[in-house]
C-alpha cells in the first residue's frame, strides 16, 4: 500500500515550455504478494494495481491527463536442490507494469486569424496500449563460494504492450565471480 506525491512532474517525468507543466501528481497503489513453501517446491506470486492523478494548471499543449490506472502481476513455481543444495529451477509467467486506462487531452494550435491570434483545437489522445505483454520463462540459479549463475530462457508476446501476432524468444545469462 503506498502513496507518492510530486509537485513538479508526472511519474518522474518533467516538462516545461510549450508542453505545459504538471503542478501536482499523486500516485496511489496497492499490492499483494504471496509465498507458499511445499517441501522442495515453492511458489511466489504478486499482483499490483494503482492510479495516478495529475493537475496541469500552466498554459501549454497538454491540457490535462485523465486519471491513469495501471497493473502488473507475476507467478512462479520453483524447485530447489536440483543439482546442488544451493540451486533452483522454475517457471515464471508475468506481466510488466501496464497502463490499463489512460488518455491525454491536448490543446494544439491549428491556425491564425487575420488579427494574428492563434487558434487552438482540443484533441483527446488514448494512451491505453493495444496489447498486453506476457512473459513466460524458465529460470535457473545457483550460488557457490566462488561464483553465482543465473539464466533464463523465455517467450514474450505483445512486447512493450503493443499488439503483435508473433511470439519472440529471449535468453539471458548472468555470471558473477566472487574475488574475495
Across the structure, where does each feature detected by a protein language model lie?
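Outer-membrane beta-barrel "beta-signal"
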Residues: 77, 88, 166-180
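Outer membrane beta-barrel transmembrane domains
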Residues: 1-24, 29-37, 44-157, 161-165
Amino acid at each position: 500500500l503506498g502513496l507518492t506525491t510530486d509537485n513538479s512532474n508526472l511519474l518522474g517525468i518533467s516538462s516545461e515550455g510549450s508542453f505545459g507543466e504538471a503542478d501536482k501528481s499523486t500516485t496511489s497503489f496497492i499490492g499483494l504478494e504471496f509465498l507458499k513453501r511445499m517441501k522442495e517446491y515453492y511458489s511466489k506470486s504478486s499482483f499490483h494495481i494503482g492510479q495516478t492523478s495529475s493537475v496541469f494548471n500552466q498554459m501549454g499543449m497538454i491540457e490535462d491527463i485523465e486519471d491513469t490506472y495501471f497493473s502488473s502481476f507475476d507467478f512462479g513455481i520453483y524447485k530447489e536442490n536440483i543439482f546442488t543444495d544451493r540451486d533452483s529451477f522454475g517457471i515464471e509467467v508475468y506481466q510488466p507494469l501496464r497502463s490499463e486506462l489512460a488518455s491525454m487531452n491536448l490543446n494544439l494550435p491549428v491556425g491564425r486569424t487575420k488579427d494574428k491570434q492563434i487558434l487552438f483545437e482540443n484533441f483527446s489522445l488514448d494512451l491505453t496500449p493495444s496489447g498486453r505483454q506476457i512473459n513466460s520463462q524458465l529460470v535457473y540459479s545457483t550460488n557457490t563460494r566462488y561464483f553465482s549463475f543465473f539464466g533464463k530462457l523465455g517467450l514474450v508476446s505483445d512486447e512493450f504492450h503493443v499488439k503483435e501476432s508473433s511470439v519472440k524468444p529471449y535468453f539471458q545469462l548472468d555470471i558473477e565471480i566472487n574475488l574475495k
